């Protein structure tokens, strides 16, 4: 008996499915959201497919059930009706409350099923859900810098598949590995480690992004034990580490942590490697000096170690093809016995012959010692005997150190006026010798709105510039020192300078500032200083002459003492330094005429004529030695010569010769250079760059400028230029043998020069000084702009006189 069919409610699974579908269309998602809409449509299609499968199963059951009607047919019909109602409501974009839907399902009248069997519905294919497209994952592993992904289509059992393979980028390597994401990168790393000696940490260094693209700073490299050992010993040289650093426990552990099998040896082996590195760099420098086309200017100086060992330091200077000033230390020898002129000359000549540059010398800069005078005389004779072809028979060879001259002049002047600054020395010593008194001074400085971090320098007997620095700092803290005296008169009244003494200190400070600025300017080694000597020394001479008639007696006494020493060295100064000033297009001959008229009065023309003869003699020497010396013919006449060679008419040929002789203009680079107006330039001026751009216009004068401007007017760097006690070799190196000391100092200088501008390596002899002195030079230039204007006015007056007009 068939049970009655009524309004049966839908099954629980259908209700849960309907609730899930309704929640996907909650009121909070009424805004058009494509993602959730696609998801709801997918659930709808799955529900319809499930309902269709249920109907098929029930139909098959009825077909095998002897014509009995399934009691659940009405239930299936109600479920199908319920799903259609929910789908229609979702399609209309309306939200349905799940509780209301349940009530509607319960009370909705259901149609009565008929007893006849229902036709079996055809099974509907289940629609496939469209999967959202995924963004391709970016390869972040460093192995892909050495492999390239390629897609390969393969066929398996009649079906085609796409496989991804990674091919090695190294030349002549055909290795490839599966590159799908689930395969990983271990195989790639193992291949790089075993076949190409690349391990983790060496594959790629940090990269930077430029316009969205990764740019590697360096390329992968193969580990080289020889290169690593060279870097280690180069670090010992450049940073002046002790040799036994290779035996330090924690340093060895550090190296072993980087590479356990690194062959770090003992200090004896380190010394051997350093000597080998020195010989290697020496051979490179020898080949480089062989190709230099210009002449060399040299400096020779004596150094002292803590064990009183004397060393001779010989440095060569030249201007390369790019018109950059170069310098190299070519000798650092231990000189035994007395430093006689003969011994010094023999050592210097041996060094020049050793480097094969004895025939390319131009000048030698030395200190003002009696032994050096004898040494220079012997060196010139030795070089002439070897046919070294010295310029003008050595007339420009000996150059006296300008900084040493200024040092001697300043010391003689300070020795006379030492008593006038005794109180300043006393009060500076008082506040610096006690921390409590220094704190009191700094408290007074704060009350006067002064910079407490500036500090006060103290006077040192062997450094004349320390007196200048002490006066500068004391004058800066003058308000604080006066305030300190007022707060404790019992302690400071006797040692604090009076108002008149402060005025005297200010006057001395202004006088010494001229010496300080010029010494700092002429001590540079990174720029040409030869063209700055003549103008600077003329300014000093002019100032000393003015101080000799100063209203204050103390200044006059100081000026007289300075004048005696200055005149002694001014008379024997090298004429080549005046030539260097002549080669400065801002001054030429006009500046020399200006100062000669100022110093010699009406007889200045005699001195100017002597100077011009020296210039012409130097020009003739280079003209005779230059294989490419220009001829005194114009370009038009040269083209005429070519025409004459091709012309067979003798009469016409003679006529052309007559025309050429008639309008031929004898041209001379020297006369052309002197006839051109002065270069108007303010601020810093790069004289080497200026001559570099005039090579085609003045081929002979540029050769002269290239040799003359390489002259060093100082034998020391700025940090030791003010010392009267000489230079001292580093105490950590003085126990080493002279051979290894030379290797360390020379190699450091050569390597640092080859890396010029990349890294600064502090050195014991100051070979790589910073160009801070250029700022002082610019300030000094501004202070003397009036004199430069006088020189230009003097030039204009001369031109007016030459043209027949009155000034």
Swiss-Prot record:
GO molecular function, one term: protein dimerization activity
Name this protein carries in UniProt: Putative AC transposase
Biased composition (Polar residues): 84-98
Organism annotation: Zea mays
Residues forming coiled coils: none
Keyword check for Ribonucleoprotein: no
Bias type Pro residues, positions: 110-125
Keyword Transmembrane helix appears in the UniProt entry: no
GO annotation (BP), single: DNA recombination
Ranges for region Disordered: 42-140, 785-807
Location of the region described as 10 X 2 AA tandem repeats of P-[QE] in the Swiss-Prot/TrEMBL record: 109-128
More about this protein: This protein is coded by the transposable maize controlling element 'Activator' (Ac), which is able to activate chromosome breakage at a specific location; it may be the structural gene for a trans-acting function required for transposition.
Disulfide topology: none
Alphabetical UniProt keywords: DNA recombination, DNA-binding, Repeat, Transposable element, Transposition
Repeat positions for Sequence: 109-110, 111-112, 113-114, 115-116, 117-118, 119-120, 121-122, 123-124, 125-126, 127-128
């Amino acid at each position: 008996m068939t049970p009655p069919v009524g309004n049966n409610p839908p099954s629980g699974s259908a209700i849960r499915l309907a609730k899930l579908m309704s929640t996907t269309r909650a009121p909070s998602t009424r805004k058009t959201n494509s993602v959730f809409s696609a998801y709801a449509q997918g659930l709808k299609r799955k529900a319809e497919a499930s309902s269709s499968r249920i109907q098929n199963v029930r139909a098959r059951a009825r077909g095998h059930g002897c014509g009995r009607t399934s009691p659940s047919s009405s239930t299936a019909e109600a479920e199908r009706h319920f799903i259609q109602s929910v789908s229609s409501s979702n399609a209309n974009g309306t939200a349905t409350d799940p509780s209301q839907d349940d009530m509607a399902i319960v009370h909705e009248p259901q149609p009565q099923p008929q007893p006849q069997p229902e036709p079996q519905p055809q099974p509907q294919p289940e629609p496939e859900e469209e999967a959202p497209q995924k963004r391709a994952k970016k390869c972040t592993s460093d192995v892909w810098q050495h492999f390239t992904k390629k897609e390969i289509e393969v066929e398996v059992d009649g079906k085609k598949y796409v496989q991804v393979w990674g091919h090695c980028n190294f030349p002549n390597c055909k290795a490839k590995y599966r590159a799908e994401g689930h395969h990983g990168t271990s195989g790639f790393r193992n291949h790089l480690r075993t076949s190409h000696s690349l391990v983790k940490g060496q594959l790629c260094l940090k990269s930077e992004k430029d316009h969205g693209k990764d740019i590697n700073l360096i390329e992968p490299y193969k580990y080289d034990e020889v290169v690593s050992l060279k870097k280690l010993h180069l670090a010992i040289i450049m940073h002046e580490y002790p040799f036994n650093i290779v035996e330090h426990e924690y340093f060895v552990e550090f190296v072993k942590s980087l590479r356990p099998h690194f062959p770090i040896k003992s200090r004896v082996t380190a010394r051997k490697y350093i000597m080998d590195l020195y010989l290697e760099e020496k051979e490179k420098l020898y080949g480089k000096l062989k190709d230099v086309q210009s002449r060399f200017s040299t400096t020779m100086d004596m150094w002292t170690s803590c064990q009183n060992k004397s060393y001779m330091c010989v440095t060569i200077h030249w201007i390369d093809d790019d018109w950059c000033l170069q310098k190299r230390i070519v000798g650092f020898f231990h000189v035994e016995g007395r430093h006689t002129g003969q011994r010094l000359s023999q050592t210097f000549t041996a060094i020049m012959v050793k480097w094969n540059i004895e025939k390319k010398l131009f000048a030698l800069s030395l200190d003002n010692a009696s032994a050096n005078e004898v040494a220079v005389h012997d060196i010139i004779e030795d070089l002439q005997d070897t046919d070294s072809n010295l310029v003008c028979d050595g007339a420009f060879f000996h150059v006296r150190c300008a900084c040493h001259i200024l040092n001697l002049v300043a010391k003689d002047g300070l020795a006379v006026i030492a008593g006038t600054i005794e109180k300043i020395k006393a009060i500076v010593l008082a506040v610096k010798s006690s921390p409590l008194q220094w704190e009191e001074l700094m408290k007074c400085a704060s009350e006067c709105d002064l910079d407490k971090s500036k500090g006060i320098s103290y006077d040192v007997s062997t450094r004349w510039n320390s007196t200048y620095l002490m006066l500068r700092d004391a004058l800066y803290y003058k308000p604080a020192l006066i305030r300190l005296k007022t707060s404790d008169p019992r302690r400071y009244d006797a040692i604090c300078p009076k108002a008149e003494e402060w005025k005297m200190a200010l006057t001395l400070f202004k006088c010494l500032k001229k010496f300080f600025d010029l010494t700092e300017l002429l001590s540079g080694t990174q720029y040409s200083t030869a063209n700055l000597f003549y103008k600077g020394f003329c300014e000093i001479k002019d100032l000393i002459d003015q101080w000799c008639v100063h209203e204050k007696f103390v200044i006059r006494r100081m000026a007289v003492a300075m004048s005696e020493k200055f005149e002694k060295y001014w008379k024997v100064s090298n004429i080549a330094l005046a030539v260097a000033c002549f080669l400065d297009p801002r001054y030429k001959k006009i500046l020399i005429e200006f100062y000669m008229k100022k110093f010699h009065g009406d007889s200045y023309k005699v001195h100017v004529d002597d100077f011009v003869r020296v210039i012409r003699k130097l020009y003739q020497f280079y003209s005779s030695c230059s294989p490419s010396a220009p001829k005194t013919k114009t370009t038009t006449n040269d083209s005429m010569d070519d025409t004459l060679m091709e012309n067979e008419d003798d009469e016409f040929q003679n006529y052309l010769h007559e025309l050429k002789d008639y309008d031929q203009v004898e041209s001379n680079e020297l006369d052309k250079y002197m006839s051109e107006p002065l270069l108007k330039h303010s601020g810093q001026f790069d004289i080497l760059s200026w001559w570099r751009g005039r090579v085609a216009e003045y081929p002979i004068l540029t050769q002269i400028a290239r040799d003359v401007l390489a002259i060093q007017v100082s034998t020391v760097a700025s940090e030791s230029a003010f010392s009267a006690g000489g230079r001292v070799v580093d105490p950590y190196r003085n126990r080493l043998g002279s051979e290894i000391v030379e290797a360390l100092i020379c190699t450091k200088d050569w390597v640092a020069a080859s890396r010029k501008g990349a890294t600064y390596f502090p050195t014991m002899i100051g070979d790589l000084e910073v160009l801070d002195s250029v700022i002082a030079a610019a300030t000094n230039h501004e202070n003397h702009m009036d004199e430069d204007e006088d020189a230009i006015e003097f030039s204009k007056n001369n031109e007016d006189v030459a043209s027949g007009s009155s000034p």
